[in-house]
Regions:
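Thr-biased low-complexity repeat/linker tracts and other Thr-enriched repetitive architectures
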Residues: 365-415
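Cleavable N-terminal signal peptides
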Residues: 11, 21-22
Length: 415
């Protein structure tokens, strides 16, 4: 063998060894089971992961080789886990019926293996039946390599996941059955005749008649802000009364990684008397945007930096239909004990408009339209598929998605 060839082979082996050493293998075992949980004071059977409700935080660094063994201990249900927002091979995506993945049968194990090719705030959840609603969801955070901050604006002294979710006393199967009986089954804050009179006084009889006729043609209510109501809203799996708390010390910067893991609830998030700076959206860094409040849609994530000065702050995530709050606390650990939460007064209920529906025009003049709307090919009567409706609420004015890497630090969801 020539000296030149030997030299080339030696370099190749060295590079391979260097790459192999740098790529850490991060392994997790997740056991899916059904257990009794007590969230609202009533013991109920729900899905747990490793005995926890909600599922545990998974942490990686960019470049890791992820190995996640999922053990399905549900008695009569296939299961699955989808890694929301992650770039990975199709067979590892975790959606039954796609990419030759059939789900995980009862008492079987499936091993997810993939290279972690990005960083940011993400989450994971079931893609089987209504298991996500029943508890199979959890946070997932990927740090930059060696957890080195990428920009000065993202540097923080503390780093917390704030997982928002909704819990119902009915199972996902019961909820779906009710919605099949009546699409408006859970609309228990409907308008009354007095609302109609107020609209007539404000807009006039003709305009009111036209507006009401259009909503009737769509078979939809103006109050249909959320498909399901009677939820208890959670923060990191805790009710407002249980008061999830993130600690800090005076002068520290705190990163809050908000994840909306709800089944179908949107939230308006605020921390009274504390400005937030949005630094990331859906795992992607953005030009910093200072805000007093932001709206987070289902499955979205937003990272914010805060610089608390007071001893206590209340984190308030108000549901878009104004039916309740997910609440937690930021607390200076060097001060007096954490204060009890103060339940805010809900803001006035909003009503949908035709503009919200992408229908700010005269429907009655549309040629060939059957006014009962039932014959329109491909139209879902809950209007969720209508062009013009933004479901994920991800567009925030002034936000610049530059797709570059994020940074991150250790999380603490235990408090």
């Amino acid at each position: 063998m020539s000296r030149k060839l030997s030299h080339v082979l030696l370099i190749g082996v060295g590079l391979f060894s260097s790459t192999w050493v740098m790529a850490a293998v991060k392994e997790y075992d997740l056991t899916i089971a059904e257990q009794t949980v007590n969230i609202t004071g009533k013991p109920l059977k729900r899905i747990t992961v490793n005995g926890k409700f909600v599922a545990p935080l998974l942490e990686f660094e960019e470049g890791d080789d992820a190995v996640i063994r999922v053990h399905n201990k549900l008695k009569n249900q296939d299961s699955s886990i989808h890694w929301h927002g992650l770039i990975l091979p199709g067979i590892m995506d975790g959606v039954p019926g796609f990419n030759q993945f059939d789900g995980i049968a009862p008492n079987k194990t499936y091993e997810y293996k993939f290279k972690v090719r990005q960083n940011g705030t993400y989450w994971y959840h079931s893609h089987s039946k209504g298991q996500e609603q029943d508890g199979l969801y959890g946070p997932l955070v990927i740090y930059p390599k060696n957890k080195v901050p990428l920009t000065a604006g993202e540097k923080a002294d503390r780093d917390y996941v704030v997982l928002l979710s909704d819990f119902h006393n009915s199972t996902s199967g019961q909820i779906m059955s009710n919605l099949k009986k009546e699409a408006d089954y859970y609309q228990n804050r409907r308008e009354t005749v007095f609302d109609v009179f107020r609209q007539i006084k404000r807009d006039g009889l003709k305009a009111t008649w036209k507006d009401r006729s259009m909503w009737n043609q769509m078979r939809m209510l103006k109050t249909d802000m959320s498909d399901v109501t009677n939820y208890t809203f959670l923060m990191n799996g805790k009710t407002p009364e249980q008061n999830w708390t993130g600690n800090f010390k005076a002068g520290e910067k705190v990163r809050l990684r908000f994840i909306n893991a709800s089944a179908m609830s949107l939230f308006d998030v605020r921390i009274p008397n504390l400005k937030m700076t949005v630094v990331s959206a859906d795992g992607q860094p953005v030009k910093p945007v200072p805000v007093d409040e932001f709206r987070i849609g289902t499955a979205e994530t937003y990272d914010v930096i805060v610089e608390p000065k007071q001893a206590n702050y209340q984190i308030e995530a108000e549901s878009i239909d104004r039916s309740g709050f997910s609440i937690g606390t930021l607390h200076d650990e060097n001060t007096s004990p954490v204060k009890s939460i103060v339940m805010p007064t809900p803001r006035p209920r909003a009503l949908l408009t035709m503009e919200d529906m992408g229908m700010n025009h005269d429907m009655s003049s549309m040629k060939g339209m059957d006014h009962d709307m039932s014959s329109m090919k491909g139209m879902d009567h809950d209007m969720s598929s209508m062009k013009g409706m933004d479901h994920d609420m991800s567009s925030m004015k002034g936000m610049d998605h530059d797709m570059s890497s994020m940074k991150g630090m250790d999380h603490d969801m235990s408090s």
